[in-house]
Amino acid sequence: MKVRFATIEDSNDILSWRNDSESRKNFKDSSIISEASHKEWFEDKLGSNKARLVVSELNKEKIGVTRFEVEDGSILVSINLSPHSRGKGYGSKMLLLSEEILDFGSKEKEDYYRAEIYKDNIASIKIFEKAGYVLKSSKDNILLYTKLIK
């Protein structure tokens, strides 16, 4: 498995994965995202010094994306695998490799990663726990997992 920073050429794949019905169940906004709205969001993230999108590939095929975003003194992390890559055990390796290439974090005084996961999203819970994230708190239907940045 290889990871790299996203480029504009990844936009359509990431939108397709985001709008997949299984993916949408696990987003705060579960509606279908328009191409125009996604394009604006995607270009904003690519140009931001506070966000990184990391694409994972296996045998030169894109299998998912990990998003990192500086927010509230920590780095918010989310992960989305392509529909054909789910359930194969790729998620935690994707996440760990993506963390390794990050070029911001503790340098900017963010000392931990943070993932907000729906309680019924068992696959994501397993991914983050396997990657060393620890349950910090629970509120309503959301679990907060954290991991110190090394």
How does the language model describe each region?
Residues 4-32:
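A short, well-structured alpha-helix characteristic of acyl/acetyltransferase catalytic modules
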Residues 31-84, 139:
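Acetyl-CoA-dependent GNAT
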Residues 87-102, 125-130:
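Conserved acetyl-CoA-binding loop-helix of GNAT-fold acetyltransferases
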Residues 112, 138-150:
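C-terminal "cap" of GNAT-fold acetyltransferases
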Residues 113-125:
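Conserved beta-strand-loop-alpha-helix junction that forms the acyl-donor binding cleft
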Residues 1-9, 134, 148-150:
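Conserved N-terminal entry element of GNAT/NAT acetyltransferase domains
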Residues 82-84, 88, 119-120:
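Active-site acidic-Proline motif in GNAT/NAT acetyltransferases
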Residues 129-139:
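Conserved acetyl-CoA-binding loop of GNAT-fold acetyltransferases
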